[in-house]
Amino acid sequence: MKFKYGAIVFSGLLGVSAILAACGTRGKFDQIDDGKIKLASSLTSKGAANALQAIVKKYNEVKKPGDYPIEITQIAGGYDQARVDLQSRVGVKDKTNFYNLILNYPDVVSVLARNQMELPFDGVDVSKISPNFLNFNERISGVSKKANYAIPVSVSTDILVLNGPVLHYILNSAKGESKGAQKDNKSAEVQRKSTGQKTVTQPLTIATDSATNGLWKKIEDAAKVNGKKKEEKKSTRSKRATEGTQTTKENTGGDAATSDTKIKESWGAYQEVEGGLKGYQFKAIVFENWHDLIDFSTRVAKSFSKVKDNSNKKGNEIQGVLGVDNSPNALLSSVFAAGNSDYNNFFYKVQNGRADFSNFNNKGSSYKNLKNVFNDYKNLIAQNGLYVNKGGSYSSNFQKFHQLAYSISSTSGFAYSFAGQNSKRFKFTDDGTFVEYPSYTTEVNAPESNNGNDGKQQGQSDQGNLLGTFEVVDKSTSDIKVKPKTQAESKKSSDSKQTANTGKGSNSKQQTPKKTISLYKTKIPQDKTENVDAFLVTDSELISKLEKAKNKKEETKASGKSASARVAVQATQKKQSNEKQIVGYTTTSALSEDGKHIFKLGKLNSENYERKIIVGATVETLEQSTTLQSEEAIVLAAPGKYKDSDQKRVMITQGPNLIGVHANTKENEETKKFVNWFLNKTESWEVKGNGKDSQTTKSLTPAQYFAESASYILPLKETVEKDHKEQTNKNTYVAKALEMLKEVSENKSVSYSDPSDFRSGRFRDALGANFNATINSKANFEKFFQGFKAALGSDFDK
C-alpha cells in the first residue's frame, strides 16, 4: 500500500510525543514571533560545532539593522536525538521554544510534512550547488509541493582505507616471502625448523594487470615506510608516577621485511588452509565490489588463528580483517547496487510525495538481494573476521594500531584515523585493554599534601572531601593574555619544564590564563560553584578509584630497570619533586563511559561538551612501526558494486542538511534571508595555516567555511565538476571524495541516499541493530530477518 502521511507511530523511542501525534494533535501551527531565528544543532564534531558558532557570530555582526539575529539551540545526543526532539515539539505544537532551522537528515522533512510544518526554500539561491546533489528532494514523502526543503551543506561519503603494512604482511606471508623465507633453501630450512614455520606449498600469486600492479606497489611502499621509521621504545607513565624513561634508536632495517616482522608480532603466523589464501590469486578488483571484498576478507580470516579462533576479542587484540563503521550504509548500498541502482528494485521508494514499501513487504527483489548480501557476510562473521561499530567505537580506533587490515569509513573522519609521530593510548592496568589517548585531555591531580597554606587548606580542613583538581582555559579572561616570558626567563626555567614542544618557538607565544576545577565527593564548598569551578562526584565506583589513586604513595617503578635507567628516573624525580600526583585524566572528547574505567563527569558552563573522566590507566607512547600513519594508508572508494558484473557504480552521499521549519510569515522570511547569506555571501574567516599553530585569513561563503572546518564537502558546481587528479590536498579522504563526487556529477556513478520518509530512520536503525547483533549470535538469515521485521512494527505492513 502507498502512503502520503503513513502510520501513526513514528518510533517506539518517542514515548509521549508519539502518543500525542496519535491522538489527533497533528496539523500546522504558527510559532510566536520572538524576533530571532533559532538554529537547532546536534553536531558532535568540535570542528563543525565551532565553525557554526563562528558563523552565527559573523551573521549577527554583518546583518542589516532590523534583520533578525540568529542563535544556536543545542540538542545533545546527535542526529537521532535531534529527530526525536523535533518530533516531540511538533507533537505538542510548541509555539514558544521551537526552532526555525535544523541541521539533520532529509527524513526530518517528512516528519515535519506530516504536520504541514516543512518550509520550502522558495527564493533561496541554490544555483551554485550541483543539481545532482539536490535531486534527493524529489524523494521526500509527504511534502505539499515540489521544492528544495533540505540543502546539502556538508556532504561526505564512504571510503575503503587499506592498512598498507598489515596488508603487505598478509599477502607476503601467503606468497611465502615474509621475513624468514630466504632465497637460500638451506638457510630457509634452518629458519623454519628453529621457528616452527611451515613451508608454503601453494603460494598466493599477485595478478599482473596494471591496476593490481599499481596497487601492489603502493602496498609495498607503505610497508617500506613502516620499516624505515624510528622505533621508539614504549614509554609508560603511570597515572601516579610523573616520569618514565624513553629512548630512541634508529631502525637500520629500512625495508618491508622489518615491517612484516613487527606486524607478525600482533597478527601471528600465516596458516595455509583450504578456503583461505592457499593458491589464491590477488587482484585489485576485490576492493571494487562487496562480494569479492567479503570473500577475500573471509579467506584472510581463515588464514590467521588470531582472527578465526577468537570470538570474544579484547580491546588490545586483533579485531578482525574488515571494519565497517556504518553497517546500514554497507547493507543498503549493496542491496541498491544489486538492484541495478534503481529505487524501483529497492526496499522502498518515494514518488510524488508518497512512500511505497511494497517491494519490501512482498519479499520482492530487495529481499532476495538482502539475503545474498547477508549470506556473504555470514561466512566472514563465522570466521570472526568482521568488526562493526556498535556505538561510537570506530574502526579507525583499531586500524591505527594495526588491529584491522582495512575498513569502510566516512570521509569526514580523516582527523581521527591515523596515529601521530608520538601516538599515545590509555592502557588500563587491571585488564590490559586500552583506548586511544583522546584530544582535549588534561590530567586530574591529587589534592596537594599538607605543605604550605594551600596544602593545609585542601588537606586538613576538607577532611577528604576534595578528590582532585584539573585546569581548563579560563574563558572569562580569555582576552587577557599573560605577558610572555623573556628569552632569558624561558631559558632559566626550561630545564625543569621539558615538554614535547620544546624548541618549537613556544617562548614567543602568549600564555592563556587557566582556572582550577575541583572535584568533591560530599559537598561543594560555599566559595565554589557547581559546573563553574567545581563538580560533585556521586558515582561510588569513581569515588573509590579516585581515592585509591590519591592515597597510594608515589612509586618510582625503577626496580627491574637498568642501573642507568634508575639513575635517570631518580634524577628526574628529584628535579620534579614539586610536580603534582596524577590520579586520572579528563576529556571533552566523545568517549563512551563504561562504569569501570571511563565515567561521566558533567558539563562546565563555559564548555560546549560533557566531560568524561578516565581512571586506572597508564599512558603509553607507542613505537611508530606499531601504528598507522597517513602515508601508509591506501585510500580507495568504498565498493561501488555488489558484484563485478553490476552495470553501475554506487556512491553513498550523506551528511547533515540545512532544513527549514515553518514558524510564521516574518520568521520564515528572515530564515530564508539567513540561508541565502549562508550559501552565497563571501566573508573573511580565520582558518588554520600551514604551520602547526598558524592561522590565515580566507574569503569563503559561510557554507564553504563550515564544510572546510568539518572535513566535509560543499557540493558546489565549481567543486564537483573540477578535475582533481593533480590535487595536493593533504586530507587524502577529502581528495578521494572529490574524485568520487566528480564521477557522480558526470553520471559515471549513481548517488545513493535513503528515500526520505518519516519511517526511514527507524528502518535504517532496525536494519543496522539486527545485523550488528549477528556478530555475536551468528544467526542465520531467517532469524536475522525475523528480528528486523519485528523491530519495525506493524505500520510498515500497511
UniProtKB/Swiss-Prot annotation:
InterPro entries to which the protein is assigned, alphabetical: Lipoprotein_10_C (IPR004890), Mycoplasma_lipoprotein_cen_dom (IPR004984), P68-like (IPR054825)
Q: What is its main location?
A: membrane
Ranges of Basic and acidic residues composition bias in the record: 178-192, 226-235, 478-495
| Signal peptide region | 1-22
Q: Which domain of life is it from?
A: Bacteria
A Pfam family matched in the record = Lipoprotein_10
Instruction: List compositional bias (Polar residues) regions by residue number.
Output: 193-204, 496-515
Where do we find S-diacylglycerol cysteine lipid attachment? Answer: C23
The alphabetical list of record keywords is: Cell membrane, Lipoprotein, Membrane, Palmitate, Signal
The GO cellular component terms are:
plasma membrane
Question: Which positions anchor the lipid (N-palmitoyl cysteine)?
Answer: C23
Location comes to: Cell membrane
Stated membrane topology is:
Lipid-anchor
Region of interest (Disordered), residue spans: 178-204, 226-260, 443-463, 478-515
Give the family this protein belongs to, as stated in its UniProt record: Belongs to the MG185/MG260 family.
Q: Which NCBIfam families match?
A: lipo_P68 (NF045826)
Can you name this protein?
Answer: Uncharacterized lipoprotein MPN_200
Q: Which organism is it from?
A: Mycoplasma pneumoniae (strain ATCC 29342 / M129 / Subtype 1)
State the taxonomy lineage: Bacteria, Bacillati, Mycoplasmatota, Mycoplasmoidales, Mycoplasmoidaceae
